[in-house]
Amino acid sequence: AAGLAAVLFDMDGTLIDSEKVWDHSLVEVLRWLGGTDLSPAARRETLGGNLPSSLAIVFREAGVEQEPELAEKAARLLVEKTAELFEEGLPWRPGALDALRTVRAAGIPVALVTNTGRYLTDKALVGIGAEHFDVTVCGDEVPRGKPAPDPYLRAAGLLGVPVADCVAVEDSPTGIRAAETAGAAVLAVPCEVAISQGPGRVVLDSLVGLRVEDLAAVLVRVREDSRA
């Protein structure tokens, strides 16, 4: 695959169908705070977000002041609930496992780049398989999580490849912004919200039947767009 240095996969909503798990946990915390349910707009806001940003949305929705002690308890509850659900096993997104295997078989470096913290990511990796990845970068291991470019820049740095020669596979506007800001080409595979075509990305319905040639073509197309 000419020019393709690495493939950087997001986790939640891209490889595994875990956005619903997060949603369930966030609603539990919201109810613990005295709220009832997340509004559709708030749900969209939490997609691809990290723990602090999602918690802030839950507190806002509950109409409760985010005092340090209460916020700490809420964060613990959110992690505990999510960990329980992660341990039950997470379903793969369509075509995701085959896509990972295809890239690995071609000898192309692979990174997992997620806004989820290390503790929960390691729980998810029990089911996903850590062996699929050369490196994993978590939201609590960088100064700023997505939508900031830090996670993608760190992943490319750990792999020792230029980020501009990488394709990031993402499902959320938050993650896409992070990857595009970092300078990676983006293959967007929408999960919970629609993603529009744009100059820095190619949008596909799913990862089913994905070939290395398709990923290389994403890189070529994005480079052409940037020169246009």
Protein language model annotation of sequence segments:
Residues 1-5, 101-104, 117-228:
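Asp-based, Mg2+/Mn2+-dependent phosphohydrolase catalytic module
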Residues 43-44, 85-88, 110, 141, ...:
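Generic anion/oxyanion-binding catalytic loop in active/binding sites
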Residues 2-106, 119:
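N-terminal helical cap/lid subdomain that shapes the substrate entry/recognition surface
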Residues 47, 109-112, 137:
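Intrinsic disorder/low-complexity signature
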Residues 15, 92, 110-113, 144, ...:
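Conserved SAM-binding loop
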Residues 37-38, 66, 110, 132, ...:
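Residue-level detector of short coil/turn "hinge" positions at structural boundaries
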